[in-house]
C-alpha cells in the first residue's frame, strides 16, 4: 500500500465508527481505453461503516494482489496481538 501522510492511529483515540458489512470480490482487468490487453487481477473491497449516530457510509477501494497480500499480513499481525491480550 502507498505511504499515508496521516498520523498513525492512536488506540486511545475516540474511534466511534463501527464496521457494519465487509464485502470483497476478485476481479480481472482485461482491457481499458488505452490498453487492449491488461489481464491483471485485483481485489475490490466494499466496507459499510456506521458512525456514532447510526448513519451508514459505504467506502469502496481496489487493491493489486501485492497490496492485498500486505493488507492480509497486517490483519494476521493484528489477530496475533489480539490473541495475546
From Swiss-Prot:
GO terms for cellular component: cytoplasm; nucleus. It is found in: Nucleus; Cytoplasm. InterPro entries: COMM, COMMD4/6/7/8. GO terms for biological process: negative regulation of NF-kappaB transcription factor activity; signal transduction. It comes from the Eukaryota. Ubiquitous. Expressed in brain, heart, skeletal muscle, lung, pancreas, liver, kidney, small intestine and placenta. The keyword Transcription regulation applies. PROSITE patterns: COMM (PS51269). GO terms for molecular function: NF-kappaB binding. Residues 18-85 form the COMM domain. Keywords: Acetylation, Cytoplasm, Nucleus, Transcription, Transcription regulation, Ubl conjugation pathway. The modification N-acetylmethionine is found at residue 1. The keyword Oxidoreductase does not apply. Belongs to the COMM domain-containing protein 6 family. PANTHER family: COMM DOMAIN-CONTAINING PROTEIN 4-8 FAMILY MEMBER, COMM DOMAIN-CONTAINING PROTEIN 6. Scaffold protein in the commander complex that is essential for endosomal recycling of transmembrane cargos; the commander complex is composed of the CCC subcomplex and the retriever subcomplex. May modulate activity of cullin-RING E3 ubiquitin ligase (CRL) complexes. Down-regulates activation of NF-kappa-B. Inhibits TNF-induced NFKB1 activation. Component of the commander complex consisting of the CCC subcomplex and the retriever subcomplex. Component of the CCC (COMMD/CCDC22/CCDC93) subcomplex consisting of COMMD1, COMMD2, COMMD3, COMMD4, COMMD5, COMMD6, COMMD7, COMMD8, COMMD9, COMMD10, CCDC22 and CCDC93; within the complex forms a heterodimer with COMMD1. May form a homodimer with isoform 1. Interacts with RELA, RELB, NFKB1/p105. Does not interact with NFKBIB. Interacts with CCDC22, CCDC93, SCNN1B, CUL4A. This is COMM domain-containing protein 6.
